[in-house]
């Protein structure tokens, strides 16, 4: 019989798992004599009318015409000393994800795909505002076509054509492996064995070694151990010092210029804070004499946006969604960010930390308690600090449809200083990007510099300052990158202000920005702007009303 091209979806059970351990309740397995030792489950999903029938308010007679049934099949095959699940239809929804090897399909694809014949990639960029995207190409391409940031992005899925066509004509993989090849049912055990052999190789390191630098942790047992380490660290804060590996950050892109306050709820505390910071959270727990930090607090304690009186006025998040934490487990580095755990390659972690430690430090005036970026810039602008404030003084680059800020401050040394609050990695990523964009435009766009010089002259007049316009070369004058040190300045408050360390993902984006600046010919520096701990007040409580007796 002629073999036809068939597409199958294969998953690998964890070592020691049996078919009965890997299916959801209600799935009945039976021996299948078509393949030696195999087991099979066949059934349908559904049985009732579709949900949209309610919207149309259909009669029973009309609904009877719309019985919605979907068939599925699961075949469990023993091969190479392990069990494999081959799913058909919606069979995969009847499988327990925790019973299967994570990234099995991705690893097989990485080891078998032709690196110049990729077709699509599913990519996740971890941050406080994690983004996911699928990129597809119209023709065979190498990895450069997918704009993968090898120091930040996680590849969750990959598809392409294998180097050896005998293995398959097309492969795609994430946790499961989907492959297309000419075969009949009798070939399934060998197909599974070949996939398992590819899974065990490390050929991928020749072209995709960076894939192991950052991994999203999804194994429940590992997450439990990491959560336990987080709970232990928070428990230690109740009686001891707060480690510099523990922070709080907004889990969304947050505008620090909003006049928001926050409260930590879940342990009967009424304090109102002007900043989200780990020191305030710990102080509140100490004030309420929380005896020990328990696992349930990670979801039971919450952060609420509120007004100055403590009334809820905005969003809220579980405290774990806001925690940023770095720890080691079994010799490997892990990072918690936006409620997700990531395993970080130790070499990468050490490299970005060492890089940051070697960056030139720059001195900036301290911030006052409760100052955000806007208030800080406004006060320093008139404080006689040998800096001209250009905050919000936008200039449009030649041919651009948008305007940019050259910097927040132009120092009398020529340094261009960019300022942001340490509220989240996403805000800091914006800061680092702002610096590189500005530096590139300054270098390449003479007319932009002319417009900027006009802006500077206006500010000099407004603030009664002189000498700053001459620091920026006009379009008719040679431009010197050496004349402009690019400084990233981050406002940090609370415990360790001025000696803080950036969260891991911020360190990664900082190194990328600094290297780009160096490639453009600039030097780069970093400044911590120390700010006292945020002000704490008590939420105003509604006065109790005395019931008024009604005369009989």
What does each model-found stretch correspond to?
Residues 1-157:
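Long, charged/polar, low-complexity intrinsically disordered N-terminal extensions
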Residues 3-5, 24, 80, 90, ...:
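Extended catalytic cores and adjacent scaffolds of nucleotide/polyanion-binding enzymes
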Residues 55-69, 193-196, 382-407, 476-478:
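Active-site metal-binding core of divalent-cation-utilizing nuclease and nuclease-like domains
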Residues 61-71, 431-441, 463-474, 507-513:
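Short, charged, amphipathic alpha-helix that recurs within catalytic cores of restriction-modification
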Residues 150-368:
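Long, charge-dense tracts
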Residues 344-404, 527-530, 537:
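Catalytic-core elements of nucleic-acid end-processing and repair enzymes
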Residues 408-421:
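Conserved catalytic cores of phosphodiester-cleaving nucleases, focusing on short active-site segments
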Residues 422-463:
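Catalytic cores of nucleic-acid endonucleases
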């Amino acid at each position: 019989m002629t073999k036809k091209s068939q597409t199958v979806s294969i998953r690998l059970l964890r070592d020691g798992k049996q078919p009965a351990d890997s299916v959801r309740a209600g799935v009945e397995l039976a021996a299948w004599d078509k393949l030696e030792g195999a087991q099979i489950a066949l059934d349908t999903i559904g049985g009732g009318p579709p949900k949209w029938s309610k919207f149309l308010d259909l009669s029973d007679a009309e609904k009877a015409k719309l019985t919605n049934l979907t068939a599925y099949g699961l075949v469990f095959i023993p091969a190479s000393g392990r069990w494999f699940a081959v799913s058909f239809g919606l069979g995969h929804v009847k499988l327990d994800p925790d019973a299967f090897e994570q990234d099995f399909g991705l690893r097989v694809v990485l080891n078998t795909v032709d690196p110049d014949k990729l077709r699509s990639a599913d990519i996740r960029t971890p941050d406080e505002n994690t983004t996911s995207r699928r990129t597809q190409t119209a023709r065979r391409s190498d990895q450069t076509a997918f704009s993968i940031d090898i120091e930040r992005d996680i590849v969750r899925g990959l598809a392409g054509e294998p180097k050896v066509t005998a293995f398959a004509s097309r492969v795609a993989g994430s946790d499961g492996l989907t492959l297309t090849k000419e075969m009949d049912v009798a070939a399934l055990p060998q197909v599974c064995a070949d996939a398992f052999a590819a899974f065990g190789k490390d050929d991928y390191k020749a072209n995709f070694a960076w894939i192991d630098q950052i991994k999203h942790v999804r194994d429940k047992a590992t997450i439990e151990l990491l959560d336990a380490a987080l709970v232990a660290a928070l428990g230690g804060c109740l009686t001891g010092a707060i480690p510099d590996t523990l922070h709080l950050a907004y889990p969304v892109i947050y505008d620090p210029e909003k006049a928001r306050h926050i409260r930590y709820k879940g342990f009967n505390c009424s304090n109102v804070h002007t900043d989200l910071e780990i020191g305030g959270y710990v102080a509140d727990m100490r004030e309420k004499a929380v005896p020990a930090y328990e696992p349930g607090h990670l979801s039971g304690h919450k952060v609420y946006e509120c007004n100055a009186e403590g009334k809820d006025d905005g969003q809220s998040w579980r405290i774990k969604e806001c925690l940023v934490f770095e720890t080691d487990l079994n010799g490997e580095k892990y990072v918690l960010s936006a409620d997700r755990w990531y395993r970080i390659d130790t070499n990468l972690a050490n490299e970005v930390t060492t890089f940051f430690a070697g960056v030139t430090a720059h001195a900036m005036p301290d911030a006052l308690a409760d100052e955000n970026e806007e208030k800080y810039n406004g006060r320093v602008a008139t404080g006689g600090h040998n800096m001209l404030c250009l905050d919000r003084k936008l200039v449009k680059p030649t041919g651009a449809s948008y305007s940019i800020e050259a910097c927040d401050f132009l120092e009398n040394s020529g340094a261009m200083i960019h300022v942001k609050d340490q509220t989240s990695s996403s805000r800091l990523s914006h800061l680092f990007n702002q610096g590189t964009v500005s530096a590139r435009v300054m270098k390449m766009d003479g007319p932009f510099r002319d417009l900027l010089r006009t802006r500077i002259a206006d500010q000099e007049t407004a603030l009664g300052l002189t000498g700053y316009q001459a620091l920026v070369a006009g379009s008719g004058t040679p431009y010197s990158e050496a004349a402009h040190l690019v400084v990233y300045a981050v406002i940090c408050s609370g415990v360790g202000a001025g000696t803080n360390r950036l969260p891991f993902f911020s360190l990664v984006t900082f190194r990328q920005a600094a290297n780009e600046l160096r490639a453009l010919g600039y030097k780069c520096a970093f400044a911590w702007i120390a700010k006292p701990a945020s002000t704490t007040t008590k939420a105003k409580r509604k006065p109790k009303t005395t019931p008024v007796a009604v005369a009989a």
